């Protein structure tokens, strides 16, 4: 893992959160792998039991385009948690969410392939 790789991993994570906060759908689309799945654990509205809610690359780009993150405070912190050859895990702490990103190298690009997130505080 080179210093350039680490910088590229951090750039992918930074692009993700900054695109969300600014409504930049093109930037979001560029940092995500086309097969991305973004998941959260939500309580089912009927049963009250935990269930998995998932978004695709397309869902994420459209939510970004709609400005769903633009009303949030702009502060965030990106931490590279671990790296190994062609994969990495990063954590993004923002005012509202904690996101764990799995990032992988595809040829010379690092892209986010999966996200698991949860609100900082339950609503």
Regions found by a protein language model. Name each.
Residues 23, 45-46, 98, 112:
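Enrichment for repetitive, rod-forming helical segments
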Residues 24-29, 65-68, 118:
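Amphipathic alpha-helical interaction segments
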Residues 89-91, 98-123:
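Short beta-strand edge/turn micro-motifs at domain boundaries
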Residues 1-35, 46, 50-51:
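Short, low-complexity N-terminal intrinsically disordered segments enriched in polar/charged residues
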Residues 36-37, 121:
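Short secondary-structure capping/turn micro-motifs that flank functional sites
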Residues 33, 41, 116-118:
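Residue-level "edge-of-site" marker
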Residues 4-8, 37-97:
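Surface-exposed, charged secondary-structure patches
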């Amino acid at each position: 893992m080179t210093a350039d790789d680490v910088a590229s991993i951090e750039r992918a994570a930074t692009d993700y959160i900054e695109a969300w906060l600014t409504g930049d759908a093109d930037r979001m689309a560029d940092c995500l792998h086309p097969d991305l799945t973004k998941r959260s654990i939500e309580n089912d509205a009927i049963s009250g039991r935990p269930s998995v809610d998932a978004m695709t690359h397309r869902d994420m780009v459209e939510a970004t385009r709609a400005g769903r993150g633009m009303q949030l405070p702009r502060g965030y912190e990106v931490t590279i948690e671990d790296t190994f050859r062609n994969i990495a895990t990063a954590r993004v702490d923002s005012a509202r969410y904690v996101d764990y990103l799995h990032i992988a190298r595809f040829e010379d690009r690092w892209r986010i392939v999966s996200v698991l997130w949860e609100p900082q505080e339950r609503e």
